[in-house]
Amino acid sequence: YNKMYPDYIAAINRLDDNVGKLVKKLKEKGLYDNTIIIYTSDHGSHFKTRNLEYKRSCHDSATHTPLIISGGMFKGGVVDDRLVSLIDLPPTLLDMAGIPIPKSYSGVSLLKEMRENKERDCVFIQISESQCGRAIRTKKYKYSVRTLAPTGYVAHNSDVYFEDYL
C-alpha cells in the first residue's frame, strides 16, 4: 500500500492535468460543445489490503470505479448514485447518437434510465483473471462467490462456487 499509493496519486494528477489540456484544446478548436467526454476506469484498487490481488477481485474497492459523462444531455453538476456497469456505456453512446441499440446488448442506456427516472435494483460483477469470482451488488449489499482455482487463467468458470467473504 505505502509503496503503490504515491504512484497512484501521481497518475491521477497527471490524468487530471491532461484532461484539462484536452478540454482547453477542444474549446479552442470550437469542438467542445459537440463532444461527449467519458472518464472511467476498468477497475479500482485496494492495494492488496483485502487479498493478494490489488484490483482483480469482487471487493468494493476494486469494483467501485468513477464514471463521469459530460456532453449531450449530460451537462454536469449532477451526482447520481444509481447502480451502473461499464457494460452500459455502448448502449448509452448509441442512444446519445440516436442509433438503435441492438437487442443482443446486455447493458442499458443510462440516458434512457435518466429520462424515464428508472433505476435498477442490482448489477452483476464478473472477474475471470487472477481470481474467478462473481457477485451481485445492490445499493446496500453484495453477495460474492469465487472458485477455488488458483487463478482465473486456469479456470475462468466453474460448476461449483464458494462464498467469498469480503
Question: What are the language-model segments listed below?
Answer:
Residues 1-10, 54, 74-84, 97-101:
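Active-site rim elements
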Residues 1-35, 96:
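A long, amphipathic alpha-helix that forms part
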Residues 6-9, 13-20, 62-63, 84-91, ...:
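A structural signal for well-ordered alpha-helical segments within the folded catalytic domains
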Residues 25-78, 85, 132-134:
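Histidine-centered active-site microenvironments of extracellular/periplasmic hydrolases
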Residues 33-35, 77-138:
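Polar, surface-exposed loop/tail segments
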Residues 57-61, 128-166:
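C-terminal, low-complexity/hydrophilic appendages and adjacent surface loops
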